């Protein structure tokens, strides 16, 4: 299986500890393609709950895909490393524009400055 940054898969995330996102759920691959080829992968969890409070670490996504909820939120505060054997079914690949949004939210989550500037949300995170 070739895993690429920006791919969305269903994954089995159990067992979990505490408030980690678990169960059979969609995830977005956020690790670079070289790392994906040679090691475990880094993912961000997804929620399809529409009542979830949006935070600067959340990226809403709308898709046109038959076998997947059409709207979901990528939660960049819920990142973790998983073995690729946890990835089950490929769903789709996000657009480069959507991945730039994910990069910004990830930078906020990790407190990373982008291009020498601090994102307005990162100042308060």
Give residue spans per PLM region.
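Conserved functional hotspots at enzyme active or ligand-binding sites that engage polyanionic ligands
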Residues: 1-25, 29-125
């Amino acid at each position: 299986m070739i895993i690429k940054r920006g791919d969305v898969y269903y994954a089995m995330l159990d067992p979990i500890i505490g408030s980690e996102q678990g169960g059979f759920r969609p995830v977005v691959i956020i690790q670079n393609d070289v790392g994906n080829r040679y090691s475990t992968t880094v993912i961000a969890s997804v929620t399809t709950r529409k009542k979830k409070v949006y935070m600067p670490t959340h990226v809403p996504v709308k898709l046109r895909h038959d076998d997947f909820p059409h709207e979901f939120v990528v939660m960049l505060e819920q990142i973790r490393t998983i073995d690729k054997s946890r990835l089950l079914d490929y769903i789709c690949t996000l657009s480069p524009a959507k991945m730039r949004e994910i990069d910004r939210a990830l930078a906020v989550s990790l407190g990373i400055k982008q291009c020498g500037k601090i994102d307005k949300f990162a100042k308060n995170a």
